[in-house]
């Protein structure tokens, strides 16, 4: 990293985490690889300028604390202020599903999609049990772990998450119809496009679009051109509403259309039947005679890349293996 002013050269946060290099961007801040100088352990650090117009890292850190201990939720090491930044130190994770999709030439086998679907449904269900909805379900926000957690899927980036019911009374937030679209238009639910307050059903519908994105390589409402962001969102919304689920899922097992139709049929306050949705895909998985052995498409590719690297003096591996946050 250059030592010009404004760089993070010799930037130590929380007294012991030394920033190494930028590895990504979240919804509201940059993410850095850092090293714990007391034991050499690598961690991830999310930085947000204290001058940010809509600071949300403190909010996100509180959310992670509420979610701590859940499977596939990164562990928070430290939150505080350093120089002009709000700082969140957390577990270092592996590549996102978007990174891995690109690494696999934007093709996932049905086996990989179904193994992912199982973990993704469980991650979202856990967040919902803690009285929050994520509101930005997309491939970029699901990351694989590293080391002994390399087959475990993690859900990250809770900057847009919202409490949908009271912890004590279990009172659900009220239905509203004047909301701006929160999240990523490509994966947004139809109701989110229509300005309806989001609830559990919307996270689940978004996941349905993510799964079909992996199946199809792209969604019919991708690549639409428009003069303004607002017009683009309008076009995406129109295309989404005019594409029947059966057309979207044509050529793929009926379970994907069943999943989406189920999610779209949920009422605003209704709890999704997560087990039913997992079972849809688990039974399909068994019908297709797959083994749940955590051998994903990238597992094979990485092994091949590692073998090639080993035979060519061991230099090429990093270039071929997705890294980063």
UniProtKB/Swiss-Prot annotation:
What mutagenesis or variant effect is reported for residue 216 to T? In strain: Jersey
Q: How is it modified after translation?
A: Phosphorylated by MTOR in response to mitogenic stimulation, leading to its activation.
TM regions (residue ranges): none
Q: What is its EC number?
A: 2.7.11.1
List the GO cellular component terms: centrosome; ciliary basal body; cytoplasm; Golgi membrane; kinetochore; nuclear speck; nucleus; spindle
Key words of the record:
Acetylation, ATP-binding, Cell cycle, Cell division, Cell projection, Centromere, Chromosome, Cytoplasm, Cytoskeleton, Kinase, Kinetochore, Mitosis, Nucleotide-binding, Nucleus, Phosphoprotein, Serine/threonine-protein kinase, Transferase, Wnt signaling pathway
Q: Which residues bind ATP?
A: 23-31, 46
The record's listing under InterPro entries reads:
CK1_Ser-Thr_kinase (IPR050235), Kinase-like_dom_sf (IPR011009), Prot_kinase_dom (IPR000719), Protein_kinase_ATP_BS (IPR017441), Ser/Thr_kinase_AS (IPR008271)
Please list the residues that carry the modification Phosphoserine: 4
- Give the sites modified to N-acetylalanine: 2
Record-linked Pfam families: Pkinase
For this UniProt entry, which residues form the secretion signal? none
Q: Where in the cell is it found?
A: Cytoplasm; Cytoplasm, Cytoskeleton, Microtubule organizing center, Centrosome; Chromosome, Centromere, Kinetochore; Nucleus speckle
Domain Protein kinase, by residue range, is 17-285
Cross-referenced Gene3D superfamilies: Transferase(Phosphotransferase) domain 1
Biological processes, Gene Ontology terms: cell division; intermediate filament cytoskeleton organization; negative regulation of canonical Wnt signaling pathway; negative regulation of NLRP3 inflammasome complex assembly; peptidyl-serine phosphorylation; protein phosphorylation; signal transduction; Wnt signaling pathway
The family this protein is said to belong to: Belongs to the protein kinase superfamily. CK1 Ser/Thr protein kinase family. Casein kinase I subfamily.
> Know the name of this protein?
Casein kinase I isoform alpha
- Organism of origin: Bos taurus
Classification from the root reads:
Eukaryota, Metazoa, Chordata, Craniata, Vertebrata
